[in-house]
């Protein structure tokens, strides 16, 4: 048994020995799905609902079920967007994968679903303190285990890597439309930040404004242009670009692979060495 297996067993037991309405905050590449399967094997549910934000995550669940010979016939998959179809249904356990990505409307739907269900497990590897606070307040879910990237690297569970941060000022010239406002991305970011700061002083919820502000960064023209510059600089190097949204991935002028891609074999071709550059979203 590897240390990864031991840690997965520990976190599975933490959930089982809790009130079973909690969140596991386990770093990317650790094995959140396999930890969940260990929970299933112990509590032996007859029905499972797994909510996911995009199809690639659903495919990851199915791949691990197949590899570990877990009977997936008892599992119902649903996207975060379609959770509303399950408000009046009961399951032995409900998994909300990437729970930090729930929208305000989806959180309201979860409130209804949770009224009829006793075992809830939220999974995340990217949870800010603000989102954690919101999920606790709105859904009464607590983080009962955290396993950081730093700890996983220290223990040799995942491979170490180097991060180089390149700061890019937001564009303050090009007008863009943000709902009914026409302004630069910098002015939109500043406007949202002003409201967020004001609400924080009043101790009010700012999670969804923060998500809107994050989308400004994800869709940033300045960041897009800087990425194009870097791709030219490393034109002979193998580069994989992780993007927050499909629109940006498609505008990088390189092959892109995401849930809306028509060519499903693109990433496999890149993985075996074809081409130098590729953009992906939520790989």
Spell out what each predicted region is.
Residues 19-39:
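Walker A/P-loop
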